């Protein structure tokens, strides 16, 4: 989902710099909207690196760029005003971005073509809270093509592509999101998606659990009509399991994060490319010979390590899990404690989904020019809040890059940055009683179906089992071919 670091500005040798990048930021909020808090989050926090390369990403209307979207009166060409985006005039640019994304998302386009006539989501009213990027827009438009009505907001205050949000609003999707939301804006947008007259959701698609949390806290009666929750992230899945353990989960929930297609393709392969893309775009750093520590050796961490090692970086790992630590050792990486190596590192990357993985004390000890980058789900992995202190100075140096300057001159730049469709179809169409009030993994048959949708794009041809072979292996010829515990 919908990743980066930053160039050090040349200084005298005595001046220290640390570079900080946050690639897949997800905030943890505990406050709810207040009128006074609408602009409570400083604008000096930079935008997500999920920006497109195209002119659309840099398109702005200078006449109202500083105006909060909540204060604007906007309508699309059909006269609808049931949305709140940065600038509806960006829709044409966003449409180009979505069309480009469609070319690389053959599985969703194939699903759209195969199931469009059946309309398996006819009657579904889906409220979604995810990153709003061109890729997510392809998912949303697929859900609409399959019969669903959608209302959407962003799970991340930094990652929304404004032009894509405008394009979705232009075709009638009720979108409430823009890049650089304040904390109050974030909750206001979620509330506008859920609390609307004459429309009540019966499905939830969440990334991080904030939407689910908001509905539980403010509108628990909504769950009387909700058929299920689909959760995409490890953080959100963890929150669902906590609800289930406490006996408070009142609808079935589908854990998409742990599906094979999500784990391998989104978490491993996509992160393997996006880490380099983000770092290169913002720093032009040469990785050969750089000392890098990656915190966490899950699928995201594995992808980052593979990419960095291939470019000649010297990579070590921090891990709490002995199995993942052993995997790292067998893959040729040294397993260390962050406190042991923090002074020598050129790059620090967090991929855990936990909190306080990199503390203020460790930030203070980092060498000048160190790049600090979050590839995990939550921006609490790095103690950014502690950097908002009187003794530190924030300085905007260029678009998407702020320098945070220590009293001794040290500084770092700061930038904060689909199996889901099948899961929605499965939960929405499941007969009553199939799923109880618990958290479920995507059925392996559906996971394999998602994978099969991608294969034509690679001109891949599956070998078919003979009846004798299928009997010998104890498998159905049409699958599933892996047990449910396979990851």
Identify the role of each PLM range:
Residues 61, 75-121, 152-290:
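Glycine/serine-rich phosphate-binding loop and adjoining beta1-alpha1 elements at the start
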Residues 198, 202-205, 209, 331-388, ...:
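Rossmann-like NAD(P)-binding element
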Residues 2, 19, 49-54, 61-70, ...:
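Adenosine-phosphate binding glycine-rich loop
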